[in-house]
Regions:
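A C-terminal junction/extension of Radical SAM enzymes
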Residues: 8, 165, 191-199
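Radical SAM enzyme core and accessory elements
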Residues: 1-11
Length: 199
């Protein structure tokens, strides 16, 4: 397996993790958004653009990562991406659970998005869906395949816990089969649902 070493994240780079909404179609056991806040915030495009402009003045070569919630639920994500690209940020990534709402793959191009970064928390359907919800494994795999087929670079985020650490050794072959170019292993932050969970 060959995993590309990206220039997007380096020791000296600035990374802007931009939460554009808190709405999500899933209810993951380790979600970092407090349950009472989920779905309550949805930034209008005007506000997103204003923040992107502010970020570009302070860190013009930063990497922008659009987050949620599920960012593809935002109806103006494509316009936010295009504006971020216009401002000249170093790279643009969209974190997603793979459902890819609003036909986002047809509304932006691989020239505009450096990576779609998919969240998958198990090498098997049983493990992932036990954490992220029924059907989420198939949706994520399908989303990855669609993105790669359209020429987008795909990365994968694996949030490790006692529920899925045993499947980490199974991931390399899956990454290779899916054409994943970056793989991130992250630990659970003790906030949101995770703070009250035993995962």
């Amino acid at each position: 397996m060959t995993v590309r070493k990206t220039v997007a994240f380096t020791k000296k780079s600035a990374n802007i993790f931009f939460h554009i909404l808190t709405k999500c179609n899933l209810s993951c056991r380790h979600c970092y958004i407090n349950p009472e806040q989920q779905g309550k915030s949805n930034l209008p495009l005007k506000t997103i653009k204003a923040w992107l402009e502010a970020f570009s003045h302070d860190s013009p070569t930063a990497n922008v990562i659009f987050l949620g919630g599920e960012p593809t639920l935002h109806p103006d994500l494509d316009r936010a991406i295009k504006y971020a690209r216009q401002l000249g940020f170093r790279s643009i990534t969209v974190d997603t659970n793979g459902y890819l709402f609003h036909d986002i793959l047809s509304r932006v191009s691989p020239r505009e998005v450096d990576f779609f970064s998919f969240s998958l928390d198990g090498a098997t359907r049983q493990t992932n869906d036990g954490i992220r919800g029924d059907g989420s494994y198939d949706a994520c795999i399908n989303g990855i395949q669609k993105a790669v087929a359209k020429g987008f670079a795909a990365s994968l985020i694996y949030t490790v816990s006692r529920l899925n650490i045993h499947e980490l050794e199974m991931m390399p072959s899956l990454l290779n089969d899916l054409g994943i170019e970056r793989f991130f292993i992250q630990v659970i932050g003790l906030r949101g649902k995770a703070a009250a969970s035993s995962t």
